[in-house]
Every structure is written in C-alpha cells, then in structure tokens.
Amino acid sequence: MRLARPLENLIDQLLKLPGIGPKTAQRLALYILKLPEMEARQLAQAIVDCRQKVFPCSRCGYLTDFDPCLICSDESRDKSLICIGEESSDVIAIERTGFRGQYFVLNKDFNLMEDKGLEDLNLKPLEDRLATGEIKEVVLALNPDMDGEVMSRFLATVAGSFGVKVTRLAHGLPVGGDIEFADEITLRRALEGRKEL
C-alpha cells in the first residue's frame, strides 16, 4: 500500500533512529500526525535546538549546552576519580548509581576489530587531566565486547603511563539472571570477580 510521500519520508527518517523498526517508525509517524500542530512544531524545534545547542564538554566530552558542563563544574565531586565511558548515555546510567567522581566520554563510534576509530579519538583533554597528578584512579566503564576489551587495554596503557591506578567495572551475572543461560565468558568473569561475604 502506498503512503503519502511526506509520511513515507517521516517513517524513513524515524527508521534511522537506533532501536526503531518499521512498525514502530510507522506507529510514531502516525502518532506525530495526530499531534496538534503546535505540539508537532515544538517536537521539531526541540530536535533542531538539540542539534544546534548541545555539544560535547571540552573537558570531559559529556553532552551539554554550556562549557564546562555541570558535572565538571561541580566542586563537590571527587576530582581524584575519573570514569571513562563510550557515550553520554553511559554517564547518565552511571550517575543514577550515585557515582561522585568525574568523567571522560570517548564519543566515538569505534570498531577496533576493523581498525576503525582509534586514530579519531581525542585523548588530549584526558591526558592533560592525568598530567596534573590530581587523578589517582581511572575507572574504565566500556562495553564488555571485543572492541571494549581492546579499548580498555589501550586506555589502561595510556592512563598507566601517568602512574594512576586503573580499574574496570566488574563483569558478571545480571541480577535475576539464570546461571544456566549465561555464556562461558560471563561465567568466567563472574568467577574471577567473586567477592567474600
């Protein structure tokens, strides 16, 4: 069935978003069409505003609308502890845990298995912060996939060259998960990271 061209275009644009399949894109497009015109314009303007006014903090890379960001500007944070994540969404997730250190966000799509991404990383702000001697520990909070492993080793070498302690998030079984369904790597990491009770 043929759809109106503007509707097809909206669906095609929504399909470019992560996690949005054809049915969800169509459902969202039809929902947007039902919005009062003012709300539809506000949605469109919010997207334009984000593209124009949100940028990576020059100090940590977290997405912000002023520089330095609120996290870097917060004097109550532990400046001796820095957590390195892949994306701003990682910072948002870690912030929910009550983490009180600071951050560095890579903000790069890297596929190290295909030699893509390492040369594009801007690590100068991180190296400048490490060089001050104020940072005592770097926590690597990278995804537990092959690229995350390679990047973790690379960043551990970079941070280690400044004499700081380098740790990484523990890997293991999710809360509510069944051991029988866990893969060998997850189980091995859970065993290696076990703690005394």
Curated annotation (Swiss-Prot):
For this UniProt entry, the molecular function terms from Gene Ontology, in alphabetical order, are: DNA binding; zinc ion binding
Q: Which Gene3D superfamilies match?
A: 3.30.60.80, 3.40.1360.10, 6.10.250.240, RecR Domain 1
Q: Which residues form the signal peptide?
A: none
Q: Which UniProt keywords apply?
A: DNA damage, DNA recombination, DNA repair, Metal-binding, Zinc, Zinc-finger
Q: Which SUPFAM superfamilies match?
A: Recombination protein RecR
Zinc finger region(s), C4-type: 57-72
Q: Does the keyword Metal-binding apply?
A: yes
One Pfam family in the UniProt entry: Toprim_4
An example Gene Ontology biological process? DNA recombination
Ranges for domain Toprim come to 80-174
What this protein is reported to do is described as: May play a role in DNA repair. It seems to be involved in an RecBC-independent recombinational process of DNA repair. It may act with RecF and RecO.
**Could you say which protein family the record assigns here?**
Belongs to the RecR family.
The protein's name: Recombination protein RecR
Q: Which organism is it from?
A: Syntrophomonas wolfei subsp. wolfei (strain DSM 2245B / Goettingen)
List the lineage, top down: Bacteria, Bacillati, Bacillota, Clostridia, Eubacteriales
